[in-house]
């Protein structure tokens, strides 16, 4: 398409320089319109990808325990969360459709104005004997050959922006640094005691774990009981070193968790799922 545009512009310039210069001067108007629309599509696609990821995460965490959720008092709360997530995706997709519905008419309007301006200028040149009618006819034929490639290029630009917006999170994940599995200390003793001191965890401005302090001794079995979403799995993930976004201190036989590398700490734990 780009090659077709360049070749057509060369032929148009050969036929008439004045009309071609006018056409080239009006192309930036098209670019000015396309760039904001492309950026809007990028933002909308990024929001759509994020909303879909949240919905997938929600379902993957809830469907495995759906029977338990149905028997809890939080069932209606989960229904509201589910509806909110679905409604969010619907609103984002609706916004995307609205943007696309405006894109094509705006493109056609700009092209129509350009063609009308070229015809008007061509008529003026013919009236003043600065251009022959045959040249004008040939110019119009080549002009219509350039329209479809320009439309295809603009559509390609918006699709590229949509793709960038959709894959934005994936690109950010790929840029995240890998875990450095180094050894800080050698701990060969059997664990006798774990101390949890003033542990807090917040997610999305919501306090999940609030100032928990525990002493866990060897040889005892501890049950963590609570309603769905109260932070049971989060606490286990923190203790196993799978979640580091918390405040507070965790000690293993008086040794602070920070003295261990992630690799060493995780080797001290066995995580057995309910399944």
Swiss-Prot record:
It is a multi-pass membrane protein. GO terms for molecular function: ABC-type oligopeptide transporter activity; ATP binding; ATP hydrolysis activity. Pfam families: ABC_membrane (PF00664), ABC_tran (PF00005). It comes from the Bacteria. Keywords: Cell membrane, Membrane, Plasmid, Transmembrane, Transmembrane helix. It is found in: Cell membrane. InterPro entries: ABC1_TM_dom, ABC1_TM_sf, ABC_transporter-like_ATP-bd, P-loop_NTPase, Type_1_exporter. GO terms for cellular component: plasma membrane. Residues 1-162 form the ABC transmembrane type-1 domain. The keyword Transmembrane applies. The chain crosses the membrane at residues 21-41, 106-126, 137-157. This is Uncharacterized protein in epiA 5'region. It comes from Staphylococcus epidermidis. The gene is epiY'.
